[in-house]
């Protein structure tokens, strides 16, 4: 028998990303735990009850030499279901210390998430974890909520995908969503390749963690890349101390690498860059709301944290929009957690209680219930 009072308990919130999973409890100002979305399975089978057969998150990355690393979320979509189940189990039991059967669960999902993935998420939560209530919230809608808005355009860029999502009165407009499959992971790989191509000789192997760190600490978006190249050619623009103590110096690579967000053709990807994505998404919307979207552009996701990105986007969107169009870009300092924070706010509201898909609903209608109830 379903007990409706279980929906009064603070919800567990999972913001599942290609690179990081953010987990916490509704009503809090940020996620309690942020872990790498990776599982490591032992390369050699060692049947022993005392030995972990797999490792999760940072621990898996530390032991990468002895493990096969699996990333269950690719380009924002769950593809490795067994590993994803293990990751959620780890978050429930070891990170949050909660019993899934005693708290409802909200998960964020990417725009245009395929039906089969949405239904599989519901099936797994209700059947494998016995949750009393479940909801799928559009990642961009949740991020916009964190900015106290219900109408606007969210530019979201994480580890696996970059997208522009127009939202009107709390609902995303799927026909106008634009996606670019260039994001944080591609920039890290591009950085590694560019450094080796430019003849950098590293005293230690440049692994992904070091490359990521260089990207996050030193890379930036140039306001005018061609001018920057003329101005800085041959100059040292930044230095980084490797784990073994050696210091390496960088030049033009620091702005050339993230430039792929605005010019993806540099990676051989024939898609519009960030500024044209924004313009294209807005132009696909009804003319009556276009100005409202330009007036509330919200940045979300860790890959939007590059210094200079907000200014460059503003400059180019102004050039693409009709003359005199008021444009505002909001770039919250904690925008890497925007979707999680928005979901926390959403689930804290008393009106949200009626939104939950309950275990009784699932039992009566099956997996298709999420198609009707989660927008």
UniProtKB/Swiss-Prot annotation:
Enumerate the Pfam families for this protein: Actin (PF00022)
Q: Which InterPro entries match?
A: Actin, ATPase_NBD
Biological processes, Gene Ontology terms:
negative regulation of DNA-templated transcription; regulation of smoothened signaling pathway
Gene3D superfamilies xrefs: 3.30.420.40, Actin, Chain A, domain 4
> Where do the coiled-coil regions begin and end?
none
GO cellular-component terms in the record? acrosomal vesicle; cytoplasm; cytoskeleton; nucleus
Q: Where does this polypeptide localize? A: Cytoplasm, Cytoskeleton; Cytoplasm; Nucleus; Cytoplasmic vesicle, Secretory vesicle, Acrosome
Keyword field: Cytoplasm, Cytoplasmic vesicle, Cytoskeleton, Nucleus, Transcription, Transcription regulation
What are the protein's GO molecular function terms?
chromatin binding
Q: What is the annotated role of this protein in its UniProt record?
A: Negatively regulates the Hedgehog (SHH) signaling. Binds to the promoter of the SHH signaling mediator, GLI1, and inhibits its expression.
Name the protein family. Belongs to the actin family.
This protein is called Actin-related protein T1
The scientific name of the source species is Macaca fascicularis
Taxonomically, what lineage is the organism?
Answer: Eukaryota, Metazoa, Chordata, Craniata, Vertebrata
């Amino acid at each position: 028998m379903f007990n409706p009072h279980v929906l009064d308990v603070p919800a567990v919130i999972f913001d599942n990303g290609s690179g990081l999973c953010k987990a916490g409890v509704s009503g809090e100002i940020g996620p309690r735990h942020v872990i790498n979305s990776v599982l490591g399975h032992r390369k050699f089978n060692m049947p022993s009850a005392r030995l972990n057969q797999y490792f999760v998150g940072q621990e898996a990355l530390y032991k990468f030499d002895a493990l096969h690393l699996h990333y269950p979320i690719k380009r924002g979509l769950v593809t490795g279901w067994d590993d994803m189940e293990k990751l959620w189990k780890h978050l429930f039991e070891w990170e949050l210390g909660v019993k899934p059967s005693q708290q409802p669960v909200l998960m964020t999902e990417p725009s245009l998430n395929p039906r089969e993935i949405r239904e599989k998420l519901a099936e797994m939560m209700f059947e494998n974890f016995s949750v009393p209530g479940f909801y799928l919230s559009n990642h961009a809608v949740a991020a916009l909520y964190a900015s106290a808005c219900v109408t606007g355009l969210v530019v979201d860029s994480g580890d696996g995908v970059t997208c522009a999502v127009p939202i009107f009165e709390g609902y995303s407009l799927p026909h106008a969503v634009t996606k670019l499959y260039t994001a944080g992971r591609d920039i890290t790989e591009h950085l590694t390749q560019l450094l080796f191509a430019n003849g950098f000789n590293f005293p230690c192997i440049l692994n992904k963690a070091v490359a990521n760190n260089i990207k996050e600490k030193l890379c930036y978006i140039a306001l005018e890349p061609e001018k920057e190249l003329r101005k800085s050619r041959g100059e040292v623009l930044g230095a980084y101390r490797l784990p073994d103590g050696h210091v390496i110096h960088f030049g033009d690579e620091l702005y050339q690498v993230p430039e792929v967000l605005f010019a993806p053709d540099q990676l051989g990807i024939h898609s519009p860059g960030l500024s044209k994505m924004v313009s294209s998404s807005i132009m696909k919307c009804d003319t009556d709301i276009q100005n409202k979207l330009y007036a509330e552009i919200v940045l979300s996701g860790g890959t939007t944290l590059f210094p200079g990105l907000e200014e460059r986007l503003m400059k180019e969107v102004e050039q693409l929009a009709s003359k005199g169009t008021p444009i505002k870009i909001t770039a919250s300092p904690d925008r890497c957690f925007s979707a999680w924070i928005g979901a926390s706010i959403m689930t804290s509201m008393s009106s949200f209680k009626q939104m939950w898909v309950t275990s009784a609903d699932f039992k009566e209608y099956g997996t298709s219930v999420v198609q009707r109830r989660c927008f």
